[in-house]
Amino acid sequence: MDPERIPYNSLSDSDATGKRKKGGEKSAKKRLVASHAASSVLNKKRNEGSASHGGTWVIVADKVEVSINFNF
């Protein structure tokens, strides 16, 4: 699923049955959304063949360990 189309309530504290999600499940979902969003942006930039003009990145996660290398 495209991260831009993931409904906001899919990141909520409860699932479709009303049961509360565990912390690990919420964190995993947030990491998945952030990862797909970053991949999507990088692929669009790469496919367009244009130079990067900067932008605003918002990553939502409980814990973040990231190593990112940009070669434009």
Swiss-Prot record:
Compositional bias per record (Basic residues), positions renumbered to this chain: 19-33
GO biological process, alphabetically ordered: transport of virus in host, cell to cell
Cysteine-cysteine disulfides: none
Record keyword Ligase present: no
Alphabetized GO MF terms: RNA binding
Outcome when changing V41A: In strain: Infectious clone UK
Record region (Disordered): 1-54
Domain of life of the source: Viruses
Pfam families (UniProt xref): Tombus_movement (PF05318)
Keyword terms, alphabetized: RNA-binding, Transport, Viral movement protein
Result, substituting T17P: In strain: Infectious clone UK
Residue intervals passing through the bilayer: none
Presence of the UniProt keyword RNA-binding in the record: yes
Function as written in the Swiss-Prot or TrEMBL entry: Cell-to-cell movement. Displays RNA-binding activity.
Family classification: Belongs to the carmovirus double gene block protein 1 family.
Oligomer and partners: Interacts with Arabidopsis thaliana RCD1.
Protein name: Double gene block protein 1
Organism, scientific name: Turnip crinkle virus
Lineage of the organism: Viruses, Riboviria, Orthornavirae, Kitrinoviricota, Tolucaviricetes
